[in-house]
Swiss-Prot record:
GO CC, one annotated term: plasma membrane
Pfam family, one: DUF1328
Annotated organism of origin: Solibacter usitatus (strain Ellin6076)
HAMAP family recorded: UPF0391 (MF_01361)
Protein localization: Cell membrane
The protein's name in its UniProt record: UPF0391 membrane protein Acid_3618
Bilayer topology annotation: Multi-pass membrane protein
Length: 53
């Protein structure tokens, strides 16, 4: 799934250069969603991996 987030990130960067519209705009939206999903997953994994003192 991380692979797909990188693919959509590349599409989003290309869309930013060429202008946001059509399929490019959709790729930007998907890239934003995947970014926040992975951010939440990382935060949960980080907090669950810590040991209680």
């Amino acid at each position: 799934m991380l692979h797909w987030s990188l693919v959509f990130l590349v599409f989003a960067l290309i869309a930013a250069v060429l202008g946001f519209g059509g399929l490019a705009g959709a790729a930007v939206g998907i890239a934003k969603i995947l970014f926040f999903v992975f951010l939440v997953i990382w935060l949960v994994a980080f907090l669950m991996g810590r040991r209680a003192i």
